[in-house]
Amino acid sequence: MTEPFLEKVKLSLPVGLWIENCMSSGLDPATIIAYIHNKDWTPLLSNVADPQMDMLDRLQIATDMNDPWEQAILEGYRFKFIHIGGVKRLLYFRYQLQEHRDYQQNGNQLSGLLLHSDMISNINEKIGIQWEIVTDTQTLSNTQTMQIRLKNESC
């Protein structure tokens, strides 16, 4: 059986984080795509997690790299490659999780993340080719304390 994340389109790190920043606006995907096509950044920049991100530059990177950004917004995606800093930005854009407040970093490992099962699935879809999400502790609710670490790296 094929892992679901293997079927998703692959994006470069700058484009994937751009998509996550755009999605952090809370606007629906079709509206985001329309704003991007029109290069109308004001509605996005007033609502995104990182309003300092150069949207036009990221669109140019997506175009230059032939990254299928529209399909990624509509259907989901996975990163071609993502380093620990990118994982931390993903967690911030997607779930407003921050180091020292919501988790701790120890080398190439993030621990103490309180994640619901749908969050685990979404994160795994995007980074699962390179990173693994493992249980630190199980709680009685749908929330688990998790850690994200590089695959094949001993703890």
Spans of model-derived segments:
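Structural boundary micro-motifs
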Residues: M1-C155
